[in-house]
Every structure is written in C-alpha cells, then in structure tokens.
Swiss-Prot record:
Pfam families for this protein: NTP_transf_2
The organism's place on the tree of life at top rank: Bacteria
Protein name as annotated: c-di-GMP synthase
InterPro entries hit by this protein: NT_sf (IPR043519), Polymerase_NTP_transf_dom (IPR002934)
Similarity comment text for this entry: Belongs to the CD-NTase family. E05 subfamily.
GO molecular function, one term: diguanylate cyclase activity
E.C. designation(s): 2.7.7.65
Catalytic activity: 2 GTP = 3',3'-c-di-GMP + 2 diphosphate
Originating organism: Capnocytophaga granulosa (strain ATCC 51502 / DSM 11449 / JCM 8566 / LMG 16022 / NCTC 12948 / B0611)
Single Gene Ontology BP annotation: defense response to virus
Leftover remarks: Bacteria with this enzyme do not have other c-di-GMP synthase enzymes (no GGDEF or EAL-domain containing proteins), suggesting this second messenger has been co-opted for CBASS signaling via STING activation.
Keywords: Antiviral defense, GTP-binding, Nucleotide-binding, Nucleotidyltransferase, Transferase
Length: 351
C-alpha cells in the first residue's frame, strides 16, 4: 500500500497556512485536536480541512480596504466588492491575495435576449408584477460610453496605485496587481460593470443575482459575464447548512492539489463545483475523516461516468466545468482522484 510522507506534507501545510509560524495557532490546533497528535494521516487530514487563521485572513481584507481608500480619492460612481476564496474562507494560504472589484455604477449591461426569452417561456408562471418589471427594463435607454468609462477607471486606478505602491504591476489585461509590502499581502484590482438578466431584475437586483463583466485592457473590450456573488452566497449557505463540512472538503482537495507532485490543472472554481455537486445528505452527519471516502466516491464517479462529468455545472449554475474536448482537465481530475485514493487507503483502518 502506497503511503504518503506525512511529515513532509504536514510541514508543507503549516508553511502554507501559517507562514509566520505563529505559536498560538499551532498550540490551538493540537489542543483542539488531541486525537491527531501522534497520528500522521489524521493530523494531515485535520489540518488540510481547517481554515486559515483569522489573524492572516483579516490582514488580506485590510490590505484590500487600504487600496479601496486610495481609489476613493479619484474614482466617482463606482462600487467596491470582493470576490474569491477569501470571501468563502476556502483559501488555504496564510498570505492569500484578495480580489477587489471596482464596479461602475454609471451603467449596467442588460441581457435583453434572456429577458425576452423569460417573458415568452414563463409568461403563464410569472406574476403580473414580475412581467411588468421585465417589460419596463426593455424600455430603458441604451448607454453608449460603457467601454470608455471602464477604460478611464482602469487608467485612473493605474496612475493612483502606481504612485502609492512600490510594487504595482499594470501589465495584466484584467487586473492591476499591487503588493502591500508592510502587510505582506497582494491585492488584485479588477475593473468591471454590473450585468443583469431576468433573475436579477425579478429579484430587485439583489447582489447575489447580479453578474459582473470584467474590463480587458489589452483588447479594450468587456468580457463575458460572471456571477461571483451567487457562488459566494451558495457556498456559504450550503456550508452553514452542513456545519462547515462543504468548506472542509473544498480546502482538503485544494491542499491535496497544492501538495501533489503532479501538475493538477483544476482551479478553485472547478474544485468548488466538484464539492458543491455532492448531495448534502451524503455528508450531513459525517465526521471529518468520513468526508474523505465521500470525496473519493464523488471523484471516482466523475472519472468513470461520462454523463456525470459532462453535466457537472459551476456553483452558480451558469457553465459546465468539464467540456467534452478538455482532455487535460479530465486527466487532472484522475490525478486528484489518485491523491485522494492514497489518503483514503492510509485512513481506512481508522474509520
């Protein structure tokens, strides 16, 4: 039976999640989990599922807030939001960067086609109030300065942040990347606008229903829509319903990927979907060690069942994770399955 070098893995995990070697974090880990102190596989699983300490996470948020304060000096008619794994507490690095969205409030993209389709397909199920809301949106005036507004927000942000931060990389098409050296944190600043479809309009533009579109500096275009706030809301809600178990599984797979000798080409977006897709009743009453065979079963089913893998959707439900032609990503899934399989085999005598 293949066995992992758990001493090395545990050291990797500690360096990643507690890079400053804060003793109180290590002490708390062993006091909270006395059963794992002398057992390598249990110790690794426990730490791999644990969240990053708030001491680190709070610094990432604070670095984002400092950037926001600088931008508020020069930008008008924008709204600031955060996206990414820090917002769901599924990040695995103590020194995690954070994504600050700078969203224009001057305009929004209206998905007219989606609204027209909803009016036609759901005309007998929608209330009169909702029908009127959708119809009213279609009467709105078009806005013709969208790209220029976003370009201007990007240029002003570059100028301001370059004057404030010694490390400020403005070469990336979709983000400005700064490093706050005193805090040891990176922040990605992303220029965007709101995107509204029928669901957003019907739900009074509550943030979880609104999409965003990111500005691409290189092509001077607006990218396709994303729904980061719906994903954040769904992961947080499902994990709350399962007393943190969903987030434990997400962190576990992300740590396995990070510790693997193989190059596993699966993003956090992909791993979120893999875990979110598991029926919550399967793990609602499982302890942390019992989550490992549940993950093994999920990955094994995806690898062996073409219908299941081809139908797996993102957490927000708007896109498929594994396209039929993406062989590399499916191979990466097999690699991740193998990593889980080894841990599972080492764990079985303790279940």
């Amino acid at each position: 039976m293949e066995k992992k070098n758990y001493s090395a893995l545990f050291e990797n995990l500690q360096n990643r999640s507690n890079p400053e070697k804060l003793q109180e974090i290590t002490t708390k880990f062993f006091s909270d989990n006395p059963d794992v102190k002398y057992n390598d596989v249990l110790k690794y699983i426990t730490l791999a599922m644990n969240g990053v300490s708030p001491e680190y996470t709070n610094k990432s948020r604070e670095a984002g807030e400092k950037v926001k304060l600088h931008l508020q000096d020069i930008l008008l008619d924008v709204e600031y939001q955060y996206q990414g794994s820090v917002m769901t507490n599924t990040h695995i690095k103590g020194y995690s960067d954070i994504d600050l969205l700078v969203i224009s409030d001057k305009f929004y993209t209206l998905d007219e086609r989606n609204i027209i389709e909803n009016l036609e397909v759901n005309k007998f199920s929608l209330s009169q109030e909702k029908i009127q809301k959708l119809q009213q949106e279609l009467l709105g005036k078009k806005y013709h300065s969208a790209t220029n507004d976003l370009k201007n927000n990007r240029l002003l942000s570059e100028q301001k942040l370059s004057s404030v931060y010694e490390i400020c990389d403005i070469t990336h098409p979709k983000a400005i990347k700064i490093t706050n050296k005193s805090m040891g944190r990176d922040v990605d600043i992303v220029i965007a606008n709101w995107y509204d479809d029928a669901q957003s309009v019907i739900n009074n533009r509550q943030i979880e229903y609104r999409g965003i579109q990111i500005y691409n500096k290189r092509s001077n275009t607006i990218e396709n829509r994303d729904f980061p706030f719906l994903s954040i809301q769904r992961i947080n809600k499902r994990s709350s319903e399962t007393k943190g178990r969903l987030k434990k599984m997400i962190r576990f797979l992300k740590n396995l990927k990070a510790d693997s000798d193989e190059k596993i080409e699966l993003s956090s977006f992909d791993i979120n979907a893999i875990c979110y897709n598991i029926e919550k009743n399967k793990y609602l009453h499982s302890n942390k060690y019992q989550l490992v065979p549940i993950l093994y079963e999920q990955l094994n089913e995806l690898v062996s069942n073409s219908n299941k893998i081809n139908s797996l959707k993102s957490v927000d439900g708007h896109e498929y994770i594994f396209s039929r032609n993406n062989i590399d990503k499916k191979e990466s899934l097999k690699m991740l399955l193998q990593e889980v399989k080894i841990i599972y085999s080492n764990l079985q005598s303790y279940l």
